[in-house]
Amino acid sequence: MNLTNHFLVAMPGMKDPYFQNSVIYLCEHNDEGAMGLMINAPIDVTVGSMLKQVEVDSEQPKPNQASLDKPVLNGGPVAEDRGFILHKPKGSYQSSINMTDQISVTTSKDILMVLGTEDEPMHYLVALGYAGWEPGQLEIELTENSWLTVEADPKVIFNTPISDRWKVAVQMLGINAAQLSADAGHA
């Protein structure tokens, strides 16, 4: 089972309060473990203020103020000072991986130079930190009914309001979120 390019959707009974109601985009899942980014946990920092904090300033004018006003997301509890940009593929950056033809993840600072400019990706989100699992750990959590899984949809990442992403991800499974029980069992 490889869940790369899938969403992990926290079940209502999630034991870890850090991940309650979270939606995680899995960037990698293999025999060595898993790595993903929470896509619905905004922090009290905007993209523009983050760029000032990391002293990124390009010579290009920043005409897209709305882009700079977007919130930065809490990507997860590991390496919280490390930035990850999920974006529609556009441009060439030092450290980018095309997950699909509609989703790339970039970790290099060069993408930060274009945020807020006409050269920025059409859709993007910035996350600090990531969620990580040791080999077999995610599989155990799946058998404990901590997570639902569904193939990732770029529209949920880039076009769905942050506060609606959990509900929309649940609906992708054909489930009414209001009827999802915190009590899970096995048949």
Swiss-Prot record:
SUPFAM superfamilies listed in its UniProt record: VC0467-like
Domain of life where this protein originates: Bacteria
GO CC, alphabetical: cytosol
Entry's family note: Belongs to the UPF0301 (AlgH) family.
Protein name: UPF0301 protein VS_2679
